[in-house]
């Protein structure tokens, strides 16, 4: 924020006669820094995703393809979502009913599943810390 105001003050200085170049340079520099940080964050999350995706077949009950796919989705929810994936989104993803999703979720050990409730809606994600512990033994 200070850089923003400094650049703005520089542009408003009488000797600069309203030249907006310093402001534009500062703004482009902020965009550049933000893009690099975003790239690094996405690359880091993608590396983690690939790591956990390769563990999917080794997770409990993953011998059933639907449960392995559920793990796959719950890993994405853990890495790329604040709240997780909603019950409705899971129903849509699997093209099944509420009770079918509940059945699939019950196949995942409770200690591996994080359930968040927001405005009376359930959101799910995989507890990646617990997965790490499971495979570190």
Residue ranges and their predicted role:
Residues 1-41:
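Phosphate/pyrophosphate-binding active-site loops
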Residues 3, 18-22, 26, 65, ...:
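Generic recognition of stable, solvent-exposed alpha-helical segments in well-folded globular domains
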Residues 11, 77-80:
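Basic, amphipathic alpha-helical hairpins
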Residues 42-73:
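Short alpha-helical segments that sit at the start of domains
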Residues 95-109:
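Short amphipathic alpha-helical interaction segments
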Residues 111-113:
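Glycine-centered, phosphate/nucleic-acid-interacting loop/turn motifs that mediate DNA/RNA or nucleotide
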Residues 115-137:
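Short, cationic-aromatic polyanion-contact patches
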């Amino acid at each position: 924020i200070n850089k923003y105001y400094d650049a703005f003050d520089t542009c408003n200085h009488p000797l600069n006669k309203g030249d907006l170049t310093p402001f534009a340079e500062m703004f482009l520099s902020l965009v550049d820094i933000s893009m690099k940080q975003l790239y690094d964050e996405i690359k880091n999350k993608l590396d983690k995703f690939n790591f956990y995706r390769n563990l999917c077949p080794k997770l409990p009950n993953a011998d059933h393809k639907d449960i392995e796919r559920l793990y796959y989705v719950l890993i994405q929810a853990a890495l790329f979502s604040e709240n997780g994936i909603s019950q409705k989104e899971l129903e849509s993803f699997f093209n099944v009913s509420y009770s079918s999703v509940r059945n699939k979720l019950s196949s995942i050990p409770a200690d591996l599943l994080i359930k968040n409730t927001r405005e009376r809606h359930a959101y799910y994600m995989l507890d990646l810390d617990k997965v790490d512990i499971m495979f570190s033994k």
